[in-house]
Amino acid sequence: MKRTGRQKDIVTPEKKQEQRELLRLFSANIRKILKNTDLLADDLQEIRLRTGAPLLVVAKDQEYFLTPDGALTGEWEKGYPVSPTDIRDTMDYIGSFSLYAYEDELRQGFLTVEGGHRIGIAGKTVIEGEKVKSISHISCINVRVAHEKKGCADRVMPYLWEDGRFLHTLIVSAPGCGKTTMLRDIIRQISDGESPYPGLTVGVVDERSEIAGCYLGVAQNDVGIRTDVLDCC
């Protein structure tokens, strides 16, 4: 993903690697479009593919359509139309050509991939005994790009301790305001220990892989050195 000269972002080797990992999830056509856009992975929040609909991205809380040459537009008619082949190839890349290995996660309508990115899917659902048995003929893919904001909990941490004891804490906000991001950083700081607070053993029950973003059982997000995660339970 390139940047125009109007921005002076410093792209580290680590960031370049993250961008390459993200691009590898997509079909060749969409990968090319994303490479040509002037958005960095840090800007992107979601990349949405729907069969027959224009390619759509969410960046900095704004929706944009992407044209075939990677330009951002607010006019949906100019957006690149996602084809069934784009969907099929993208799912092949997401599942490393072994989607059967992700059947349990796919039944929930999402899976987590390397890097902590979460992939939501929609298609034909087969119900058995009031539970989803499988999802096939996938026609919609939503990639939620993983982001960490280390230090975002710095200002609240002093209020979460009393007499050397961590207090019961409830985080409340409107949707999309960063509750999970804040919680992840709180967990990291409790686990690592941040002066004057000692590091503590932390157990995380990550029902939808939103906090640790586990891939093959390993947390892709930094949740601290003393943290154990129960994923997808």
Positions of PLM-derived features:
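Conserved lysine of the Walker
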Residues: K179
